[in-house]
Amino acid sequence: MFEGEFCAGWYWVIYSDANGKFHRALVGDKGEIILSAGAIGSPQLLLLSGVGSESYLSSLNIPVIHSQPNVGEFMADNPRNNINLVIQFPFSPSPAQVVRIMTSTEVSIATIAEKTTGPLSHGSLRLSSPKEAKATPLVRFNYFSDPADLSRCVKGVRKLGDMMNTNSMDRFKYTGFNGERGFMFLGPALPSNWSDDSSVEDYCRSTVTTFWHYHGGCLVGKVVDGDFRVMGINSLRVVDGSTFIILPGTNPQATLMMLGRYMGLKMLRERRESQ
C-alpha cells in the first residue's frame, strides 16, 4: 500500500514492504511513480490510496486523494471451458510454453479446452478491507453476462464435440462391461444434447473457469491516458495488464514484458528531452 503527501512541489510516497515495514520515498517535482502490480493489484492499491470513486471510497472512510470513478471497473478475463480425459496408456504430453518461462509437467490426464478471447462481459473489483493491502480483493468477472460471449462459447463447445467424434479420438476411448466404447472423464463430460442451445449454455456457465488472463481495472481511456498516466495525476502512471482494453489471443506474458520495455525507453527519452 502507498499514499502520497504533497508539499512545495515534492511528494513523499509512503509504502510498506513484504515484512510490513513502512518506508518513505521522496519524489521531486519532475519525478514519477510507476505502479505495476497487475490487473488485480494496481486497481486495489489505487483504491486503498484514495484514487477511485468518491462515493465508494467515502463509504469505506478512505480519504479521497483523486476522484476517478473507473478505477476497479471493466474487469475482464478470457473464460475457459475444458474437458479432462483419463488416458489409459503412456503418451508424450506436449504442454504449452510461453517465452521459455513455463516448465513442462508429466500428466496422465489430457485436457482439451476452448476459450472466448476478447470477451465483451466485464465486472468489477472491490476492496475486502479498506486498510489492508494483503487482503485479497473481491473480483467479479461476470463471465458470459454478454449474450455474444455465451453464443461464442456454445459454438466452441460444439466444436469440441465434433472433434471428440472423429476417428482420431477413438483410441482414447474405454470399452465398458457392456462392450460399448466411450471416454472416461475426470470431471464434467460434454453435454449429450447438442441440438438444445439452452443445454449447452448451461454447460458453459457451470463449467467455466479462468485462463488467468485477468485485465482491466485501470483501462486506457478510462483511468489512464495514452501515455499510461493516471488522468488528472501527471506524476503517476500504471503500466501493466490492468490498462488493457482487450488482450491478445494468447497468454499476455510476452505482451506485458514488451509493454514494460517500451514504456521504460519512452520515459527515458522524455527525461532526456526535458533536460
Identify the residue ranges that each predicted region occupies.
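A conserved FAD-binding loop/helix module that cradles the flavin
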Residues: 246-265
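Glycine-rich, N-terminal phosphate-binding loop of Rossmann-like dinucleotide-binding domains
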Residues: 17, 37-38, 49
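Conserved, non-catalytic sequence blocks in retroelement Pol enzymes and Pol-derived host proteins
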Residues: 19-21, 144-151, 249-254
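Mid-to-C-terminal "cap/lid" subdomains and adjacent gly/pro-rich loops that border
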Residues: 43-118, 129, 146-198, 202-214, ...
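FAD-binding beta-loop-beta segment adjacent to the flavin cofactor pocket
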Residues: 114-126, 215-237
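Core beta-strand elements of the Rossmann-like FAD/NAD(P) dinucleotide-binding domain
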Residues: 19-32, 36
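A conserved short coil-to-beta-strand element within the FAD-binding core of flavoproteins
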Residues: 1-19, 73
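Short FAD-binding loop at a beta-strand-to-alpha-helix junction that anchors the flavin cofactor
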Residues: 232-248
